[in-house]
């Protein structure tokens, strides 16, 4: 049952009508079983002073594209009711006319565009109105016998409105239906949702919760868990087995769904998902259609349901079915588009947003991790609706044509237009070794600033987590992900890539940056020192690149690797034979990989920096003292020494290297591979030739 979250003490602090509306809206949006993410809308009617100081009656309503759970006052739109109410006398009004008219009614031009369902709120005479999409209510509204069952629950207290797309016509239908039923306490919108109201904000919220719980109690009394979704056909595999399977198939899925534009993936194996994908009736039930019009833009009409018998030994069989399934889904979506398109429509990516695998769970796709999560969150709601509707009778959905018209509805697409424009690294995942250090952390910030998701791999997990947290605080949840990895440990490297595959679906950019440095005269260089440099800078770079190469080949959508070499890759560093030799190995390894990677669209380039002291764990250790001794100067004189030996007389900083990495990772260098670029201020001895 839905719990009331109303707090009298907190509510009493909200003194204005708008403040009370924000509070109520946030409570409603905090429970996704009550309101879809980005869905629903709320309003309040109040009196404010206009710019002339006169009292005017205003309705504040949710602005288009915002989410009730996180809305602030600035996300609501104020409209003059004196201008809106006469519209109910009209016989018809197009969407375009409605949007233009409401624009003239706004009390502040800086407010967002008003919700699509603004007139629904305005035409009802109540001070506070909620429109929500509760699981229990939509279960009732999507049951083939929903109207009859509603009479059992609510008697004559409800109004049933047949499905009509939101806008003027639906708003007028609702108002007239409510006016004609003096006992009406709620509106049930077929295949859509719920409308409730009250004379105070608290009364409105309490009514919303009460009505939902009446429906939920009715449904739960009829749920038979054993026969749910036709009964269990495929029990869930063990959690560790599910994760292992997903880590191996995610790159295949990512490649299959990313042929036109790359996608970020996420994995979900929550209990309700596993119950649904394991049901005997679920393959057919999942193809009936969307559970709510609000879902369509993010989930498409139906998911891709994979016909596969769970078997941990049949990974290759699952991969084949996934590739075939995605291809068939795209073809069907193309046909759906062609059959229903209107003039001027441009087809979205045809790949599925939701992929269901028996025994394993759900894979969601999107242009970002956050949007893949939106698809997943909405499909959780769809599962809940199908659970309820099938317990009541038969689950029914919109026609294919109406589903299309909602999915491609200009008023829905307007919400998508509010998102920031995509930038160079949008839809891409970067894997950065040495992610906690100066170059690694600066590179992560640089790539994320242009849309990337980044993985920070480092032995210093605490440091990597700190950088990731700072990035996520600024750019949003899970834009950065930290993990502990020893580049010299083959199993650790393989495990890290498996982790990333589960987290995001795969990788596009590898920054091979983990490092160390030692200094000794050649005749004093021990085998231990030699092996240490070769293990980290040679074997480590080899393992990171090899596993990335495998993953990129599996994806089949190309990729870019950037090796962080050194001036010493091409320059004989004094008292640094082990380090210099290992750095030379890195540079040549990169060229070798570039020679093999071309046919797969995998580019490999190398940056040769010099003397990056800022934020460097290497330079803050013994290496600083050793290099100073090699040059016969004091450690605190090193930065100035290095600056003066450059032809440009400059110091080099992590941000300079990050800029070079961004160039090699970007489309600006899409025809460049096997290249070395110095970023050292100009050290003549290291000029490549």
Over which residues does each language-model region extend?
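Residue(s) in the substrate-gating loop at a strand-loop-helix junction
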Residues: 566
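Glycine-rich flexible loops
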Residues: 1-430, 442
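Active-site helix of classical SDR
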Residues: 545, 582
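Short C-terminal tail/terminal secondary-structure segment
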Residues: 673-689
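Short, small/polar-rich loop/turn modules that mediate ligand/substrate recognition or access, typified
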Residues: 511, 598, 603, 672-674
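Substrate-binding pocket helix/loop in short-chain dehydrogenase/reductase
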Residues: 521-522, 526-531, 642
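Alpha-helical segment proximal to the catalytic Tyr-Lys
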Residues: 550, 595-596, 670
């Amino acid at each position: 049952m839905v719990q009331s979250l109303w707090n009298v003490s907190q509510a009493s602090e909200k003194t204005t009508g708008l403040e009370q509306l924000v509070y109520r809206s946030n409570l409603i949006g905090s429970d996704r079983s009550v309101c879809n993410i980005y869905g629903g809308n709320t309003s309040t009617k109040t009196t404010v002073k206009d710019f002339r100081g006169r009292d005017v009656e205003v309705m504040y309503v949710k602005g288009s594209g915002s989410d009730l759970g996180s809305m602030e006052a600035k996300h609501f739109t104020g409209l003059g009711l004196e201008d809106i109410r006469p519209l109910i006398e009209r016989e018809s009004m197009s969407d375009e006319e409605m949007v233009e008219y409401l624009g003239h009614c706004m009390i502040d031009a800086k407010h967002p565009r008003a919700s699509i369902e603004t007139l629904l709120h305005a035409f009802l005479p109540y001070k506070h109105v909620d429109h929500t999409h509760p699981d229990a209510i939509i279960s009732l509204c999507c049951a083939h016998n929903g109207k009859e069952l509603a009479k059992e629950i609510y008697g004559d207290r409800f109004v049933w409105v047949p499905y009509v797309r939101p806008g003027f016509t639906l708003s007028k239908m609702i108002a007239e239906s409510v006016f004609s039923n003096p006992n009406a306490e709620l509106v049930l919108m077929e295949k859509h949702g719920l409308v409730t109201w009250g004379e105070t904000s608290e009364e409105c919220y309490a009514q919303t919760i009460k009505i939902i719980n009446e429906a939920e109690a009715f449904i739960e009394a009829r749920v038979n868990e054993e026969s749910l979704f036709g009964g269990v056909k495929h029990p869930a595999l063990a959690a560790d087995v599910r994760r292992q399977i997903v880590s191996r198939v995610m790159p295949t899925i990512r490649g299959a769904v990313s042929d036109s534009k790359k996608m970020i993936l996420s994995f979900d194996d929550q209990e309700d998902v596993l119950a649904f994908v394991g049901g005997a009736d679920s393959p057919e039930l999942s193809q009936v259609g969307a559970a709510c019009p609000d879902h369509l833009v993010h989930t498409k009409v139906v998911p891709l349901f994979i016909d596969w018998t769970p078997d941990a030994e049949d990974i290759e069989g699952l991969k084949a079915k996934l590739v075939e399934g995605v291809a068939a889904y795209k073809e069907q979506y193309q046909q759906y588009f062609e059959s229903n398109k209107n003039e001027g429509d441009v087809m979205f990516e045809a790949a599925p947003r939701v992929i269901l695998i028996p025994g394993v769970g759900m894979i969601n796709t999107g242009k970002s991790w956050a949007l893949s999560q939106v698809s997943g969150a909405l499909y959780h709601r769809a599962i809940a609706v199908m659970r309820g509707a099938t317990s009541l009778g038969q689950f029914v959905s919109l026609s294919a044509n109406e589903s299309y018209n909602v999915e491609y509805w200009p008023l829905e697409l307007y919400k998508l237009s509010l998102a920031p424009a995509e930038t160079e690294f949008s839809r891409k995942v970067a894997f950065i070794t040495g992610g906690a250090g100066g170059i690694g952390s600066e590179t992560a910030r640089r790539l994320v600033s242009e849309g990337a998701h980044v993985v920070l791999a480092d032995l210093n997990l605490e440091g990597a987590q700190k950088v990731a947290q700072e990035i996520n605080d600024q750019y949003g949840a899970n834009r950065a992900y930290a993990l502990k990895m020893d580049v010299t440990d083959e199993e650790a490297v393989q495990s890290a890539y498996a982790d990333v595959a589960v987290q995001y679906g795969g990788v596009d950019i590898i920054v091979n940056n983990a490092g160390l440095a030692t200094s000794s005269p050649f005749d004093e260089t021990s085998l231990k020192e030699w092996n240490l440099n070769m293990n980290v800078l040679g074997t480590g770079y080899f393992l990171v690149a090899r596993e990335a190469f495998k993953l990129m080949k599996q994806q089949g959508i190309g990729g870019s690797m950037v090796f962080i070499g050194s001036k010493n890759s091409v320059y004989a560093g004094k008292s640094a034979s082990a380090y210099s030799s290992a750095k030379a190995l890195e540079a040549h390894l990169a060229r070798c990989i570039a020679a093999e990677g071309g046919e797969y669209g995998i580019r490999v380039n190398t940056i040769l920096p010099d003397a990056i002291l800022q934020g460097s764990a290497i330079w803050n250790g013994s290496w600083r003292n050793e290099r100073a001794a090699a040059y016969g100067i004091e450690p605190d004189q090193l930065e100035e020494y290095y600056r003066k030996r450059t032809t440009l007389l400059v110091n080099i900083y992590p941000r300079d290297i990050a800029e070079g990495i961004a160039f090699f990772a970007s489309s600006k260098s899409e025809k460049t591979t096997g290249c070395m670029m110095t970023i050292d201020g100009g050290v003549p001895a290291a000029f490549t030739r």
